Every structure is written in structure tokens, then in C-alpha cells.
From Swiss-Prot:
Keyword Phosphoprotein: yes
PTM statement from Swiss-Prot or TrEMBL: Ubiquitinated. Ubiquitination by RFFL induces proteasomal degradation and indirectly regulates p53/TP53 activation.
Cell compartment(s), UniProt: Cytoplasm; Nucleus; Secreted
Listed transmembrane segments: none
InterPro entries: 14-3-3, 14-3-3_CS, 14-3-3_dom_sf, 14-3-3_domain, 14-3-3_sigma
GO molecular function: identical protein binding; phosphoserine residue binding; protein kinase binding; protein sequestering activity
Presence of the UniProt keyword Cytoplasm in the record: yes
Annotated protein name in UniProt: 14-3-3 protein sigma
Gene behind the chain: SFN
């Protein structure tokens, strides 16, 4: 199928909310070997984020049920819940491995500018983070190290090449701070990164273009929400789950 046709079908699949189809079309487009435009890389991101988002949500629900059934020593629920949770986990790993393969084989190598490179390295960090959510033991440690390395490389480039209000730089810092808090168990680092990012963006807000204003201020609000949540958690109050960067 022609590349232009694949992109068009991905857009149709998005409108029809058929995200697995959308992901398959975008995977085929990436494998054609051409650099993606800004619009095309967003299509790729939206497709896979929706596919993996459903799997992550299902895995959390099933893990919670499994934990409760283990605590209650319920033989009726136990094996079936574990079996189903493992099935979802296998599917989730498969999607993450597919995305990471596309990033390493095509997208990061073909990135022609700093913004694209940061976008894809952030994506690499995100999909290793999703793998870390379901990993255990030595495997988990290796995956966490891979996520941290991708996020850090993206941060280093973004600080040199992009203004503090750039929505891709802000989204990267948001997700890296969530990684520190929820995966790496480093709340101080999470709070420090979120606060520094928010403060630097606030100081630079007057330079924002109209095009970026909505995206940037939305991510800044999420950074502030997380700071409120995490500082309450650190003070011993009950918190909740931290929001990540939304899909545009």
C-alpha cells in the first residue's frame, strides 16, 4: 500500500476510534523508511497510546482483583484471574516491544531535527516505563535503567535546543517526573523536576506563540496538579494517581 494511502487510512481509523487499525497503518508507514512529519508522528503516538492505554487500564484492574483474591485466599477466582492478567500483560509487552522496535530501527535514526529526536526519545522512555509497570525482579531493574537513559538523553537535548515553554519539552519533563515518582521511587527528584520545569516555563510564558499556548499551559497545569498531589503524599496525606501528558 502507498505511504499516502496508509496515512489517510490511519486518519480514518482515528475518526472511527479503531486504534489498533490506526496503529497498524502507522507501523506500515514508518516501515516505508521516510521521516514522519509533525502530524504523522502525532498520529503514530495517538494510535499506540490508545492501544496501550486500554491494556494498562485492564492490567491494573486485573492486578487489583488478583491481589484481593490472594488476600482472601479465594481458590475460585485465583487461577483464572492470574491467567487473564498474564494474557493482558503479554499483549501489553507485545505492543511496547513493537513501538520500541520502530523507534530504534527507524524513527530515532531518521529524526532530522532536535524536536523530532526529543519526541521519539520521550516516546522510548514512555514505553519502557509501561513495561516497567508490569515487570519484576532483575528484568524490572534493566527496563527502569533503559527508561531513565532515554528520558535523560531527551532532557539533555531539550534543554540545549528548545525553550522552556515548548510543549514537547514540557510533556517530556511531565512524564519523566511521573517516572521518578511512580517507577523509580524517587519522590524528591520527581518534585524537583516538576517544580523547576513549571517555574522556568512560567518565567518564559510571555514568549509563547498562540499556536503552542493551549498545549503548553495544559501541561503546566498537569505539572502543578502533580506537585500538589506529590507534596501532599510526602506530607503523609492520601494522594492518587499522577496524570501523564494527554493525547492531542
Amino acid at each position: 500500500m502507498e505511504r499516502a494511502s496508509l496515512i489517510q487510512k490511519a486518519k480514518l481509523a482515528e475518526q472511527a476510534e479503531r486504534y489498533e487499525d490506526m496503529a497498524a497503518f502507522m507501523k506500515s508507514a514508518v516501515e516505508k523508511g521516510e521521516e514522519l512529519s509533525c502530524e504523522e508522528r502525532n498520529l503514530l503516538s495517538v494510535a499506540y497510546k490508545n492501544v496501550v492505554g486500554g491494556q494498562r487500564a485492564a492490567w491494573r484492574v486485573l492486578s487489583s482483583i488478583e491481589q484481593k483474591s490472594n488476600e482472601e485466599s479465594s481458590e475460585e477466582k485465583g487461577p483464572e484471574v492470574q491467567e487473564y492478567r498474564e494474557k493482558v500483560e503479554t499483549e501489553l509487552r507485545g505492543v511496547c516491544d513493537t513501538v520500541l522496535g520502530l523507534l530504534d530501527t527507524h524513527l530515532i535514526k531518521e529524526a532530522g531535527d532536535a524536536e523530532s529526536r526529543v519526541f521519539y526519545l520521550k516516546m522510548k522512555g514512555d514505553y519502557y516505563r509501561y513495561l516497567a509497570e508490569v515487570a519484576t525482579g532483575d528484568d524490572k531493574k534493566r527496563i527502569i535503567d533503559s527508561a531513565r537513559s532515554a528520558y535523560q538523553e531527551a532532557m539533555d537535548i531539550s534543554k540545549k535546543e528548545m525553550p522552556p515553554t515548548n510543549p514537547i519539552r514540557l510533556g517530556l519533563a511531565l512524564n519523566f517526573s511521573v517516572f521518578h515518582y511512580e517507577i523509580a521511587n524517587s519522590p524528591e527528584e520527581a518534585i524537583s523536576l516538576a517544580k523547576t520545569t513549571f517555574d522556568e516555563a512560567m518565567a518564559d510564558l510571555h514568549t509563547l506563540s498562540e499556536d503552542s499556548y493551549k498545549d503548553s499551559t495544559l501541561i503546566m497545569q498537569l505539572l502543578r496538579d502533580n506537585l500538589t498531589l506529590w507534596t501532599a503524599d510526602n506530607a503523609g496525606e492520601e494522594g492518587g494517581e499522577a496524570p501523564e501528558e494527554p493525547q492531542s
